[in-house]
Amino acid sequence: MNQLPAEIFKAYDIRGIVGKSLTAGVVRRIGHALGSLAAEQGQTAIAVGRDGRLSGPELAGALIDGICAAGCEAIDIGCVPTPVTYFAAFELGCASCVSVTGSHNPPDYNGLKTVIGGTTLALDAIQQIKARAERGDLRHGSGRRRDADVKGAYIERIVSGVRLARPLKIVMDCGNGVAGAVAPELFARLGCEIVPLFCEVDGSFPNHHPDPSKPENLADVIRTLRETDAEIGIAFDGDGDRLGVVTKDGEIIYPDRQLMLFAADVLARVPGGQIIYDVKCTRLLAPWIRQHGGVPLMWNTGHALVKAKLKETCAPLAGEMSGHTFFRERWYGFDDGLYAGARLLEILSRSADAGAPLKSLPDSPSTPELNLKMAEGEPFALIARLKGEGRFDGATERITIDGLRVEYPDGFGLARPSNTTPVVVLRFEADNGAALARIQGDFRRAITAVWPGVEVPF
C-alpha cells in the first residue's frame, strides 16, 4: 500500500506544506479518489477553482488530471474565491466542487476544500478518501477537462438580490488574497465607492497575512478609516469565505456580533427561524435571537459541521466565531465572506450613520481565543478528564457538545480540543472584568488539577 502523508488529512479539509507533505503527485492521487467517489454517487463532473497561491496552478492541474483519470469531467473555473467555487457547483449543475486553497495558512501551504454530491467532506469522509487512494480502490476512465467562467454569473446573482438603500464609501482590504479577483467589481456594482487595500492577488501576501480574525491584520483598515471619509471597513481572508468588519472609529465587530445583526434582519422575514452558532460565540447571542423571534441552536465548531447542521435543520442562517457565515435565506447555505459583506452593507445602508447599527449591538468583556499547546492527542485526553473530574463552583450549566463550555450567572468559560492542531482552545466572557478574572481562575485551577504541569496561557 502506497501511503499518503497522514498529517495533511485534517478534520474539515486537506492541507499541507507544498513540495513536502503536499505534492502534485499526492494531489493527483487524491483527485483520482475524489473522481471515483463522485462517479460512484452518479456525479459526472467536478468544478475546480483555486485561490491566488503561487502553487495553485500546478496543484489544480494535478487535481484535474486525477479527476479525469476516474472518468469524471473536470470543469476548470480558474482563480476565484472559494465561495465562487461552491457557487459553481450550483450554477453548472454538477453538485460537486473542489477549491484548491490554503485559506489563511502561510504562503508555503495549500490544500483542498471539497464538496461531493452537495455534501462537504469532513472528518471520516476525508479519512475515507485517504484510505481509498492508498488501497487503489479507484475507477478508471478518461474524463474530459473543460474551462468555464462563473465569476460574472456569481456577481450578477448577488447584485440582483441585494439592494443598498444608499451608496456607501467603504475601505476594502483583500490582503492580496483571491477575494481581490471579485470583490472590487462586486461591491462597485452594488453601488459602493471603494478605498481599496491590497486587492491585487499575490500569493506571497507581501503586505499582511490575509486573516481578519487577528486584530493586527486589520490595522491598515483602521488607519485608512481614520485618514479618509469612508464609513465602514471590510476585510476578507485568503480564500474569501470569511469576513472582517471595522467601524469608522476603529472598533472591530467580531463575527458573533455580526451574526446578531444578520439574525435580526433574517428573522424579520423568517419569524421562528432557527439560528445556528458555534460554541465559541458570545452568550449574548441566544437571548438576542429569542428577543427577535428566533430559536437559537448552539453547535460544534467547524465550517463543514455547521454547514451540515444547516442543511439538516433547514435553518435560514448560521455563523461561527471564526468568521464563516452561512446564509440559506436568499442564498445557497455555504460560507461566503463576499456575500456576507454584501448583506452587511445592505443593512447598514438603511441608516444615515452606517456604523450605528453595529455600535448598538450588545457587548461584554471577553478574551480572544487562547491556545494551550500540547502534544498530539493530549488535548482530547485533557478535555475528557475535565468533563469527568473538573470542578466549577457556581456554574449553572455544563455544555459538552464540543469540548466543555461552563455557563455561570455572569459569564462563561470554554475549553475545546482543536480538530486541526494539537491545542486546547480557550475562550472566556463575563459581565465585567472581575467576573472574567474569576472564571479564568476557575478554569486554571480545574485544568492544572486534572493535568498537573501544563502551561495555561492566561
Question: Where do the protein language model's features map onto the residues?
Answer:
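Proline/glycine-rich low-complexity loops and linkers
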Residues: 84, 127-156, 160, 248-321, ...
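N-terminal small/polar loop signature for handling phosphorylated ligands or for N-terminal nucleophile
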Residues: 40, 45-109, 156-157, 185-246
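Short glycine-rich phosphate-binding loop at a beta-alpha junction
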Residues: 43-51, 75, 169-171, 273-279, ...
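An N-terminal, well-structured beta->alpha segment
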Residues: 1-65, 69-70, 147-168
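Gly/Ser/Thr-enriched, mixed-charge loops and adjacent short helices
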Residues: 110-228
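Glycine-rich phosphate-binding loop
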Residues: 95-103, 107, 225-247, 252, ...
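Phosphate-binding and adjacent anionic-ligand microenvironments
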Residues: 270-427, 432-458
